[in-house]
């Protein structure tokens, strides 16, 4: 049985998905132990392997849609668009057509890599005075003043124009079907709605918290207005969102609530193709987004780690975790001081990534004591920054695909906070993000709000190359935890010899502001005690939670070409391959 309105080409994968959803406490064991038995590390889920194509996405239905596209001969980008559309429907609090997106693209034929910045800009009215005249000392975290132009739809269209092969309208069919006819509410979705939906406006509460409670698990959730908007985008492309009826309704809605966006700001939006930043680490070339994202912090984190013998420290020992936490603080101090829209402010990337500078920075780690306050390496510390945030709300989805032609995409899209601005427009079904709340009003700061400026972004999709060929794609939701989780997983994979799934499932830390560190309870108590003795303020997190992101990866075996896809059990991500 399938849901009414779902594409028939997805039916064969329902059985496969059901098999894949069955978790295991440990890998399958042979019936009899051989004389030279291999030791298999326990893992929660299996690695998923294939030889033609693979996907990993933030929800099983999205992964299903992406694999169907690949099996129908589509490109990795085609699969990404299909998955992105579905995720906009089935994870509405985390991402959607009202949010932003970024992607990194590997061309299997040429080995070239390019990146797409799909973040939106502030409105023409968004001067510092616009906010200060309302007696604001900072931009609100929710509401109309927190909304910048949503860039995700333009990013889908621009990615498809360059790297897609299937008709764009066909790729949005699964998303339109789920929005119009409904999809089953999961336990995780109901929990997220319950915990994050209280700040929604009345239309948002009516849809996602009917009667004051989350929809029952297993019931069908519809957003027919969003289905209509997605159909407009499928039929009309850019005009269906940025210049037509949808743009007029969204701009009028925002203006009525006191925001700075107008219909002209929607019409002026465009994505930007950029060159990714590149850093060499552990015999791989790592590619990340340039500013306005925190990708530069990812590379500086890696470069500083070179000065420390990671393998000798040992996996998840107190010395290893302490070193990683302290290096993160140094990377984030520079990030918070300098990362902004390079079209509107000077971002000294070369200096921030200079190896000699970072070697000196790495030497600041005190092996015997955690640092509570860390200053940037140059430039004064910005007000209101503390080298990270404790917010762990569900705000982002990551998705990745590799196709039979050797092309790969590492993609991420987001509403920023859970349910973004809290504003659902009932006419269009669009939930608006709140990325515009990340501008600062601080005079002279590179990220100070200004007309037509992109805000600072935490979104960090990543890709790794080995001798010019694709090694793996990787990414995770989780705000400030993205940079931290990704380096821990890279170490697990390349230093400590774990499989992709093992690397993702291994216990992680998340350093927030000051001395605060969240740590998964699977880290031994003796290590917890040692970290406390070093001055870290530990919060021990039980079980598998979204605090530590929800990482996904596709790894290419350098000898056989076999694809191994992995997905984090901490959220709803699933991987499929064929």
Predicted regions and their residues:
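Bacterial N-terminal signal peptides that target proteins for export
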Residues: 1-14
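C-terminal motif of bacterial Sec signal peptides marking the signal peptidase cleavage site
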Residues: 21-23
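Bacterial signal peptide processing site
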Residues: 25-27
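Noncatalytic scaffold domains of N-terminal-nucleophile
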Residues: 31-64, 68, 74-243, 248-293, ...
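Active-site rim segments in enzyme catalytic domains, especially the processed small/beta chain
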Residues: 89-114, 260-262, 407-472, 496, ...
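Internal maturation/activation junctions in enzymes
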Residues: 212, 307-414, 428
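Short, small/polar residue-rich loop motifs at catalytic or cofactor-binding pockets
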Residues: 273, 393-396, 457-459
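Extended C-terminal subregions enriched in glycine
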Residues: 405, 453, 486, 495-546
């Amino acid at each position: 049985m399938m849901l009414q309105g779902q594409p028939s080409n997805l039916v064969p994968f329902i059985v496969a998905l059901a098999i894949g959803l069955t978790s295991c406490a440990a890998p399958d064991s042979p019936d009899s132990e051989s004389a030279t038995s291999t030791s298999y590390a326990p893992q929660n889920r299996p690695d998923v392997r294939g030889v033609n194509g693979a996907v990993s996405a933030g929800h099983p239905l999205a992964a299903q849609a992406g694999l169907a596209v690949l099996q129908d001969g589509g490109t990795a980008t085609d699969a990404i668009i299909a998955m992105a559309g579905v995720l906009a429907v089935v994870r509405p609090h985390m991402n959607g057509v009202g949010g932003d997106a970024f992607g990194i693209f590997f061309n299997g034929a040429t080995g070239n890599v390019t990146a797409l910045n799909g973040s939106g800009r502030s409105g023409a009215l968004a001067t510092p005075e616009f906010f200060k005249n309302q007696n604001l000392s900072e931009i609100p975290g929710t509401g109309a003043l927190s909304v910048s132009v949503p860039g995700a739809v333009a990013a889908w269209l621009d990615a498809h124009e360059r790297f897609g092969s299937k008709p764009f309208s066909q790729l949005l069919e699964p998303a339109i079907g789920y929005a119009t006819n409904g999809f089953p509410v999961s336990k995780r979705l109901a929990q997220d709605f319950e915990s994050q939906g209280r700040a929604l406006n009345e239309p948002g509460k009516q849809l996602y918290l009917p009667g004051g409670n989350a929809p029952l698990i297993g019931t069908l959730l519809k957003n027919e207005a969003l289905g209509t908007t997605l159909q407009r985008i499928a039929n009309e492309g850019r005009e269906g969102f940025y210049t037509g009826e949808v743009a007029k309704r969204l701009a009028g809605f925002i203006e009525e609530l006191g925001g700075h966006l107008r219909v002209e700001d929607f019409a002026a939006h465009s994505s930007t193709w950029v060159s990714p930043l590149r850093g060499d680490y552990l015999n791989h070339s790592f590619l990340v987004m340039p500013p306005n994202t925190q990708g530069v912090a990812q590379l500086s984190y890696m470069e500083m780690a070179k000065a420390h013998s990671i393998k000798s420290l040992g996996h998840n020992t107190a010395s290893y975790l302490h070193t990683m936490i302290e290096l993160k603080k140094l990377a984030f101090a520079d990030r918070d001081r300098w990362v902004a829209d390079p079209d509107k402010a000077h971002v000294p990337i070369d200096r921030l990534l200079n190896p000699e500078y970072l070697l000196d920075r790495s030497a600041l780690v005190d092996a015997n004591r955690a640092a509570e306050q860390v200053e940037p390496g140059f430039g004064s510390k910005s007000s209101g920054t503390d080298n990270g945030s404790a917010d762990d709300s569900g705000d982002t989805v990551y998705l990745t695909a590799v196709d039979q032609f050797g092309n790969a995409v590492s993609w991420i899209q987001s509403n920023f906070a859970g349910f973004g601005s809290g504003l659902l427009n009932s006419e269009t079904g669009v939930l608006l993000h709140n990325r515009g709340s990340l501008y600062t009003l601080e005079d002279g700061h590179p990220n100070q709000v200004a007309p037509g400026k992109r805000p600072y972004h935490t979104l960090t999709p990543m890709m790794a190359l080995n001798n010019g060929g694709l090694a793996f794609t990787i990414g995770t939701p989780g705000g400030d935890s993205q940079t931290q989780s990704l380096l821990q997983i890279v170490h697990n994979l390349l230093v400590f010899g774990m499989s992709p799934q093992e690397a993702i499932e291994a216990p992680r830390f998340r350093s927030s502001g000051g001395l605060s560190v969240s740590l998964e309870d699977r880290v031994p108590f003796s290590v917890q005690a040692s970290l406390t003795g070093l001055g870290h303020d530990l919060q021990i997190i039980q079980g598998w939670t979204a605090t530590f992101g929800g990482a996904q990866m596709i790894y290419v075996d350098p000898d056989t070409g076999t694809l191994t896809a992995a997905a984090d059990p901490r959220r709803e991500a699933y991987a499929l391959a064929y």
